[in-house]
Amino acid sequence: MFVDDDSLIIYSTWPSTLSDSSGRVIVMPDNRSFTFKEGFKLDESIKSILLVNPSSIDLLKIRVYKHRIKWMGNIFVLFEQENIPPPFRLVNDK
């Protein structure tokens, strides 16, 4: 997923699929990245938030905080999980 330079990244586990606006992979957290347990502030310079693997409580906390400070930006949610094939094989009858 491509992440804007003016986005805030909030994560529970760091994803392996983030790229910045120039196409470089963001390998490790940087100064615009926080865990859900850390404190952070939203201001007008932040245009969007990327939530990575949030729990339902994390989503609710972010939504309440966004509403309380009247922040007008976008929230994007990224869920990462293993792609496990089904335990059976699909067979075409033709």
UniProtKB/Swiss-Prot annotation:
Localization terms from the record:
Host cytoplasm; Virion
Q: Its Gene Ontology biological processes?
A: DNA-templated transcription termination
Per UniProt, what is one Pfam family of this protein? Chordopox_A15
Keyword presence, Nucleotide-binding: yes
Task: Choose one Gene Ontology CC annotation of this protein and give it.
Answer: host cell cytoplasm
This entry's Gene Ontology molecular function terms read:
ATP binding; DNA binding; helicase activity; hydrolase activity
Q: Which top-rank group of organisms is this from?
A: Viruses
Q: Which InterPro entries match?
A: A15
Keywords, alphabetical: ATP-binding, DNA-binding, Helicase, Host cytoplasm, Hydrolase, Late protein, Nucleotide-binding, Phosphoprotein, Transcription, Transcription regulation, Transcription termination, Virion
The entry's family comment says: Belongs to the orthopoxvirus OPG142 family.
> What is the stated purpose of this protein?
Late protein which is a part of a large complex required for early virion morphogenesis. This complex participates in the formation of virosomes and the incorporation of virosomal contents into nascent immature virions. Required for the stability and kinase activity of OPG054.
Q: How does it assemble?
A: Part of a complex composed of the kinase OPG054, OPG092, OPG100, OPG114, OPG115, OPG142 and OPG157.
**What is the protein name given in its UniProt record?**
Core protein OPG142
Species assigned in the record? Variola virus (isolate Human/India/Ind3/1967) (VARV)
Q: Supply the gene name.
A: OPG142
